[in-house]
Amino acid sequence: RHFLSSVSRILRHQVNFNEITLPERIVKVDSFPMGIDYNKFEAAAQNHFKNTEEQRTELQRRLDHHSNETPEAKLILSIDRLDYTKGIANRIRAFEYFLDNHPEFIEKVRLVMLAVPSRSNVPQYQRLKREIDELVGRINGKFSTVSWTPIWYFYRSMPFENLIDLYTSCDIALLTPIRDGMN
């Protein structure tokens, strides 16, 4: 509303409902609220907790196993598009720094990372993926024990029900954008 009013008053363009008439074209304007559909996620989470053992996904069974085997351990969740603005490599390095400086947390905390493929044909993004793969491999090799891997790394999209599994099972959400205005 305010944008269209400014276009009309300041720029002196004709505004008709949600359209701006310019000499060479008509621009359609609309608002798109940011964020998630909270009600959808809340309902899915509530339904999730009602699932019987047979209704649980394979991912949820694995998360449950982790929780049952190590009830004091914490899961840190990180979900982002694979994008240089998201700070994923820095986040992984910070996790390594944490484990280096606080070895008492080895086997007591795990980073669950979901990197959703994005622009996978762009060389810069291919380099970023390779860097992240190498960091995860190095850290898992450095800190893993027979019964524990510090980072569970998934490079793919996940079905909504698996996202709900992650959101409802993890203890901490970790978002570390470098340059991002939508979080």
What are these regions (language model features)?
Residues 1-183:
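Catalytic cores of carbohydrate-active enzymes across secretory and cytosolic contexts
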